[in-house]
Structure formats: C-alpha cells, structure tokens
A protein has these predicted regions:
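Accessory terminal helices/loops
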Residues: 143, 147-153, 162-236
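Active-site metal-binding loops of divalent metal-dependent hydrolases
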Residues: 32-34, 57, 102-104, 114-115, ...
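An active-site-proximal "capping" alpha-helix that borders the catalytic cofactor pocket
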Residues: 131-157
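Active-site HxH/HxHxD metal-binding segment of metal-dependent hydrolases
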Residues: 14, 27, 34-98
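Active-site-flanking alpha-helical
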Residues: 63-64, 109-110, 127, 165
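Conserved beta-strand hairpin/beta-sheet module of binuclear metal-dependent hydrolase folds
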Residues: 4-45, 108-119
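Core dinuclear metal-dependent hydrolase active-site scaffold
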Residues: 20-22, 85-112, 116, 147
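Conserved acidic residues
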Residues: 50, 120, 152
Length: 236
C-alpha cells in the first residue's frame, strides 16, 4: 500500500500485526512474526530484505526474526540499541526511529513518510499497558506522537480494535467518531490517522470537555494534563 516513496505491507499472525516497509528494491521487516508470508511477498515483488527489527522485544513480536535472518542476508537491528531520531535508509529514503518508552523500556516507533509503526505504544483507539510502571515517561511518549501531523497513519502492533472501541464507547457513548471508525476501518489493512485517534481514543482526549466531565463525575484528579491522563489510566 503506497504512501510516499516507501511503501508498507501489513501481515497478520494471531492478533499481532507484522510489517514490511519497502522501496523499489530494499525492504525492512518490523515485528515479522508472519515470516512465511513476508518471504513470499519479497519473492513475488523482487525485493531484498535488508533489515529485520522490532518495535520492542516482547516475545510475541519477535518469533519471526530468526527465520527471516536465517533465510535472507538481512542485518538485525536491535531496537534496544537504536538511537532516537536514527535514520535507517531504504533505497535512499529514511525510516526515522523514535524512542517511546512506556509499554516497555525498549519500545520504539518507526516513521516513514506519513506512516508510523507504533508497536504496543499506541493502538487504534487505545494505548498499550504501561509495563515499565513509568507513567510519566509513557505520557511523554504519547505526547510526542500526538505532536506529529494529523494525517499520520497509525499502524499498531495488534488488532485490538473491537475491544478498544467498546471501551471508548463506554467512556464516551455520545461520541460519533467511535462508531464512524468501526464502520469504515478495513480489517485487512488496519490503520487509523492521528486525526481519527484524537477524536476517538480516550487516552489522547485528556483535554477534551467530555473526558474532563467524565473525570469530574468520577471525582478523579483533573487539574492538569498529567493528572487527567493519570486518572484515565486508572479507569477500567
């Protein structure tokens, strides 16, 4: 699916989503658990796999790494050692790394053109669990992603859309953006735009009046952005 010079292909394995970024000749696998389908795609499109990497090192995102490395000449890029703002070149086009700790210490996002592969940091209509326990760091990572252009396409690490929209609707039953996304999203090529996320994802709506009223109704701290976001993270 083309979006600028670097194209993106999405693959499923369970509820996980794997990705291939590619130019005219070179490709990069991210969380490549669907390794057989990725190898088939590479062969069909005459692509050379140059890099294998991950959004983070949790086991469900890494099962394809050894298979892809063993069957190609690709280099492994360890997400734990990638630098913030590091540029990985595919046919001369940059894929930019953002370090986004929170879900895990080693979480990174990959930005190519308008496409952002977010792993378990930002999902479609929700965010990841904060397994590090560093809520402040996670909040700063989310704020950083929110500052990107509104037309940025969000490609997440899992398809949690149905449950995420159900929870978002539970918090904001009168929000039409939630149902609109449910009706229009493509389950075979799943993404949202950052503009859509800002309209439906409760964890990006901490400054919006309906969310502030919700926190007030539940008698939760809401004086600052940080307090509102912390309060949202406590709601189940």
């Amino acid at each position: 699916k083309e979006n600028g010079m670097i194209q993106i292909e999405q693959f499923r394995y369970g509820d996980n989503l794997a990705y291939l970024l590619y130019g005219k000749t070179a490709a990069m696998a991210i969380d490549g658990g669907a390794w057989q389908e990725i190898l088939t795609f590479l062969k069909q499109h005459g692509l050379s796999l140059r890099f294998v990497t991950n959004t983070h090192r949790h086991y469900d995102h890494t099962p394809g790494d050894d298979h892809l490395l063993g069957k190609t000449k690709a280099a492994f890029l360890d997400c734990r050692t990638l630098a913030d703002h590091e540029k990985i070149l595919l046919d001369g086009e940059p894929v930019v790394v953002y370090r986004t700790p929170g879900h895990s210490k080693d979480s990174v996002c990959f930005h190519a053109g308008n496409d952002l592969i977010t792993g378990d940091t930002l999902f479609n209509a929700t965010i990841g669990n904060c397994f590090t326990g560093d809520l402040r760091g996670f909040f700063e990572s989310i704020q950083r992603l929110m500052a990107l252009p509104d037309d940025t396409r969000i490609f997440a690490g899992h398809d949690y859309v149905r449950d995420s929209l159900t929870f978002a609707r539970h918090l904001e039953p009168d929000n039409p953006a939630i149902e609109r996304f449910r009706q229009t999203c493509d389950p075979y090529f799943l993404y949202s735009t950052l503009a859509q996320e800002k309209k439906m994802n409760p964890y990006l709506r901490f400054n919006e009046e309906p969310i502030v009223r919700l926190l007030q109704k539940r008698k939760l701290p809401r004086a600052t952005e940080w307090e509102r976001w912390q309060s949202l993270m406590t709601i189940e």
